[in-house]
Amino acid sequence: MKNELYADEIAARRTFAIISHPDAGKTTITEKVLLFGQAIQTAGTVKGRGSNQHAKSDWMEMEKQRGISITTSVMQFPYRQALVNLLDTPGHEDFSEDTYRTLTAVDCCLMVIDAAKGVEDRTRKLMEVTRLRDTPILTFMNKVDRDIRDPMELLDEVESELRIACAPITWPIGCGKLFKGIYHLAKDETYLYQSGQGHTIQAVRVVKGLDNPELDQAVGEDLAAQLREELELVQGASHPFDEQAFLAGELTPIFFGTALGNFGIDHMLDGLVAWAPPPMPRQTDVRVVSAREEKFTGFVFKIQANMDPRHRDRVAFLRVVSGRYEKSMKLRQVRTGKDVVIADALTFMAGDRSHIEEAYAGDIIGLHNHGTIQIGDTFTQGEELKFTGIPNFAPELFRRIRLRDPLKQKQLLKGLVQLSEEGAVQVFRPLANNDLIVGAVGVLQFDVVVARLKSEYNVEALYEPVNVSTARWVECGDAKKLEEFKRKNELNLVLDGGDNLSYIAPSMVNLNLTRERYPDIQFHKTREH
């Protein structure tokens, strides 16, 4: 392997995810980012109800109907001298587990905030997740072409609620109907806005210098005076950009713009490419793996069924941590101990797939999966190690799945097991009867399961309430005590999709009593994959 070439390839990679509250404009930003990366020529503006141009990243049937991104898609595109891997995460709050796992596969996040609303609930939760790994965050204040809150107030709110320092890089001139453009603090340049140009990349008029009389002519004397006043305040009250603090996850650069108007996105992308880290080292159960190591390693963070309705396939998304993937290379699946030849890994452009010849640390590749790969699986060139920190959560909501046609039990079980391997829901099979119980983190997931059982497995099913309020994975070092526990609690015991023993409790009171009664049994709320 040519080391210099390899080092250059890694240095060029930027792998990031977009996090936001639903409706903050994340899917539109994804579209416009791809437009700037020349990955698509005109952006399919999102969710024009009744229009045929659905956004490139919302590609599953149910997403198209609802206009929300339910599953994570992966898109790769070149920008300036970098090669950017963008992971689009579900914006809907029901899909937190999938999003959580996606955030373990990136080196940086872009936080999108609706500037009319400020910090919202979902943004807080996602920020907590990025904190666990001190992920660097860039912030895009979206929708400045609408009436927004005072920009200084927005910065204060981000600092106090999300506990991260703000360094404004760009600043809006006016907002709503009076929105005139953006001033770039580092470059001392003003970019003037033209509305109605959101579908393509337009040439933007630039005014150099804050004291340039041309600025007063372009935006009007009042707004120019207001801008100069605000900037004095901003420079006095906010933090200058500090790259080390950014990389430590302590400071976020702030960009203003409008995704729908396609304005300000390029400034944010320039910042991402300049400051976001190249592929970072990762922790395993035995050592830390550096991206610059020559031997290939990677982990699976997501499984997606039926990305191609014409083929009954499943694809495992794998983050390359080190080394280089080459076509037809032999890799060890550490969990099973088997060596497999990966002849046809995929790269993605949200739903469009193409086979790749090579991939480097930081890239996301797709492996065809016929039921043998699980979330959390590590692949290496023979070394026995396992990447850590890819969680599985105990579900909070439960339903019993019933068949309309009882003869389709076999297809139902197959469909549910495949969906559970994706990590969208968890399936539990009681030891005492033939029921099938599905557990999820959010209500919408049950609708997704029923819709996908019908469209992908031709199984008509419905769900009904079940007397379960919580579940815990069960472990015990003493086989004899575990057997006794199983004998006395059979009615509350189930096996999950991976045949792990779990306890389902009708109430928290029941769970706490059972815990007290069996001090030797461990009840776990999360499991490492």
UniProtKB/Swiss-Prot annotation:
Name of the encoding gene: prfC
InterPro entries: EF-G-like_DII (IPR053905), EFG_III/V (IPR035647), G_TR_CS (IPR031157), P-loop_NTPase (IPR027417), PrfC (IPR004548), RF3_C (IPR032090), RF3_dom_3_sf (IPR038467), RF3_GTP-bd (IPR041732)
Compartment(s): Cytoplasm
Role, per record: Increases the formation of ribosomal termination complexes and stimulates activities of RF-1 and RF-2. It binds guanine nucleotides and has strong preference for UGA stop codons. It may interact directly with the ribosome. The stimulation of RF-1 and RF-2 is significantly reduced by GTP and GDP, but not by GMP.
Name used for this protein in its record: Peptide chain release factor 3
MF term (GO), any: GTPase activity
Classification via CDD domains: RF3 (cd04169), RF3_II (cd03689), RF3_III (cd16259)
Domain tr-type G residues, every copy: 11-280
Predominant location category: cytoplasm
GO cellular component, one term: cytosol
UniProt family annotation: Belongs to the TRAFAC class translation factor GTPase superfamily. Classic translation factor GTPase family. PrfC subfamily.
PROSITE patterns: G_TR_1, G_TR_2
Binding-site residues, GTP: 20-27, 88-92, 142-145
Keyword line: Cytoplasm, GTP-binding, Nucleotide-binding, Protein biosynthesis
GO biological process: regulation of translational termination
SUPFAM superfamilies, alphabetized: EF-G C-terminal domain-like (SSF54980), P-loop containing nucleoside triphosphate hydrolases (SSF52540), Translation proteins (SSF50447)
Domain of life, source organism: Bacteria
Lineage: Bacteria, Pseudomonadati, Pseudomonadota, Gammaproteobacteria, Enterobacterales
